[in-house]
Amino acid sequence: MEDGFSSYSSLYDTSSLLQFCNDDSASAASSMEVTDRIASLEQRVQMQEDDIQLLKSALADVVRRLNITEEQQAVLNRKGPTKARPLMQTLPLRTTVNNGTVLPKKPTGSLPSPSGVRKETAVPATKSNIKRTSSSERVSPGGRRESNGDSRGNRNRTGSTSSSSSGKKNSESKPKEPVFSAEEGYVKMFLRGRPVTMYMPKDQVDSYSLEAKVELPTKRLKLEWVYGYRGRDCRNNLYLLPTGETVYFIASVVVLYNVEEQLQRHYAGHNDDVKCLAVHPDRITIATGQVAGTSKDGKQLPPHVRIWDSVTLNTLHVIGIGFFDRAVTCIAFSKSNGGTNLCAVDDSNDHVLSVWDWQKEEKLADVKCSNEAVFAADFHPTDTNIIVTCGKSHLYFWTLEGSSLNKKQGLFEKQEKPKFVLCVTFSENGDTITGDSSGNILVWGKGTNRISYAVQGAHEGGIFALCMLRDGTLVSGGGKDRKLISWSGNYQKLRKTEIPEQFGPIRTVAEGKGDVILIGTTRNFVLQGTLSGDFTPITQGHTDELWGLAIHASKSQFLTCGHDKHATLWDAVGHRPVWDKIIEDPAQSSGFHPSGSVVAVGTLTGRWFVFDTETKDLVTVHTDGNEQLSVMRYSPDGNFLAIGSHDNCIYIYGVSDNGRKYTRVGKCSGHSSFITHLDWSVNSQFLVSNSGDYEILYWVPSACKQVVSVETTRDIEWATYTCTLGFHVFGVWPEGSDGTDINAVCRAHEKKLLSTGDDFGKVHLFSYPCSQFRAPSHIYGGHSSHVTNVDFLCEDSHLISTGGKDTSIMQWRVI
């Protein structure tokens, strides 16, 4: 316990508070003007509030740790004596369902109550038109367990909505039901009205029935780790909590990452991209805003703000449903009144600024902010009624008076007006400080809209971030020059350091523990370090659309590759990259050789590379066609490599020297559309392929010949099952699917589980085989874009999923 409190004392040094309180000169009228005395009192109150919040945060962390210990003890008591396990495997057993609430651990196979854990959800709706949301994992009408927020409310302002996730509305016409032919031994399903015929093994023909029921898998998934950070297009989204956790977001998940303990917790109450984040003055309550989305049935998912507890991960309030348009891009809590109010800016054409009493879920005022983009909005630290917004071609000082917001424009006067005011913060005496696209730091006197001081050319290029440290030091972060500079109270330069080019421009800066600075970059790195030392990454991820995923055959490692031209080998135990390789073309697919010694990466241009997995050195490079290579799949014996291309062909290579020599055998031609998926037979003699027009074809790859005999192909045992079309997996397709809803399928090595990734940001877990129409599944959210790939680690202990445009990688523990 003492260690826990000592960590907080390093965050907030209270000795200065005691010294200040004992200084009688602070109240001597003869030595101070009235305004100075008021400022001093404001500082004193703020310091006392900080100290109180320190104690609150410490107590909250104690409660959190006790909850973890109790849950672990309960699990151990149920399971009885077990072998000792490493701390990394035992601590993540905290049960957090996808609505961001903590539920008691239940025996495997039991379902959480749909009513959730929040008592207030059982109370009839009050006069507020904004419903408090408590979603929990549930079984959908089709038997599928879902984790979705209940979003209700009428829009007060209309406008277009958009989403990064691929919402698709199913056809209104009733889809055709599957047909079973006992004579021929096949099931025929229909996608977009087109028949897809799938032959079953002979020994299943007599016993098969379309009406048979499939049970939900007894296993479940729990989100253990999220790789990545959204810095490329979001700001002010990185904070250190007093508990020692760094909080940030990617996709629809807010990550709370304890770097020292190497543990992550996740708030997953959102149903689409999170775009903004704010921490309450109590340092425990957090607000996050999201974009509008569309569900798989075409239902609109409105943008909103969720306020939640960072200790319990319980959702406290949901505001703005039916009011915000497109997305919520900026949010901030008030400071001087204990954080009672919250301001938000949406992404409508008018970029409406609104102020809320978030505890009552009531809107106090709203106003059109600007026709141009708004980058930041924040309350003045000592005046609750003052809000500052900045963005393209503007800096506005807003005064809240009753239910109206009155605007004063920042006057640049002799100072050349910048194209963009990029960031804003406040000094100890209440001055407003801005950083702009011209590289200038401008100081605006407290209570005025005029410049009182200017630091010309503070950076070469735009200043993307400003952070006022607890000791009154100002830190600025440059975009173009990637420099981090500290400034004294009178704006004299103290220190500067340059962030290495590989990490990209600085997007946001936050104060860490002690003299540590946290940096988020536009290349989606989170760095930590000091102004006098080096900065090292604590989180990193891809920066462009992500499709390629390959699992090592014998190690807890996996490789991802994307359109950002990066191929990264990850350690799933240490949750960090083993190496990262920049390639010449955008990458689309990858596959490990069975020996694990090499990995192949396919690109959008028809080129493919083979890398040594130990050294990341290039082994060989080849080109087949000039179109996207969607699949790279080695045969189980390691003697062949099959490459599925968007030119409708499958290229076959003979492989020798443990994956280091390649000889082209030929190409399999016969598909009338692009290749989507490939699987090898256990004996490496046959290949099955799917295409974009729902064809299922079989091949003898050594001769590049198609196999048309049903009697030959129906009983083949497949080493993997990644094809989305086939008798053993057709139950994964939802009713009315258009044939593109499911991007990836993967069978576990033990052949009892099947996972899929769909176009609606969901990861599904089915029982295998999945050969009954509309089979039930457990459904998990987290991704905000289409889930492009899923695969089980070599021992089936974890599942890895990749998001497309959300660029995230999620590691799920199989429990």
Curated annotation (Swiss-Prot):
Compositionally biased residues, Low complexity: 156-168
Residues found modified as Phosphoserine: 113
Coiled-coil annotated residue ranges, if any: 31-72
MF GO annotations: calcium ion binding; microtubule binding; tubulin binding
Gene3D superfamilies per record: YVTN repeat-like/Quinoprotein amine dehydrogenase
Effect ascribed to mutating residue 646 to A: Abolishes tubulin binding
UniProt protein name: Echinoderm microtubule-associated protein-like 1
Region named Disordered: 77-179
Main location: cytoplasm
Effect of residue 627 to S: Abolishes tubulin binding
Residue span of region Tandem atypical propeller in EMLs: 176-815
Similarity field: Belongs to the WD repeat EMAP family.
Gene Ontology annotations of biological process type: brain development; hematopoietic progenitor cell differentiation; microtubule cytoskeleton organization; mitotic spindle organization; neuroblast proliferation
Organism the protein comes from: Homo sapiens
Tissue: Ubiquitous; expressed in most tissues with the exception of thymus and peripheral blood lymphocytes.
Subunit structure: Homotrimer; self-association is mediated by the N-terminal coiled coil. Does not interact with EML3. Binds repolymerizing microtubules. Binds unpolymerized tubulins via its WD repeat region. Interacts with TASOR.
Disorder noted: Band heterotopia: A brain malformation of the lissencephaly spectrum, resulting from disordered neuronal migration and characterized by bands of gray matter interposed in the central white matter. Disease features include severe developmental delay with intellectual disability, enlarged head circumference, periventricular and ribbon-like subcortical heterotopia, polymicrogyria and agenesis of the corpus callosum.
Record localization: Cytoplasm; Cytoplasm, Perinuclear region; Cytoplasm, Cytoskeleton
Residue ranges of WD repeats: 261-310, 315-358, 363-400, 409-446, 450-489, 493-530, 535-572, 578-613, 617-655, 664-701, 709-768, 775-814
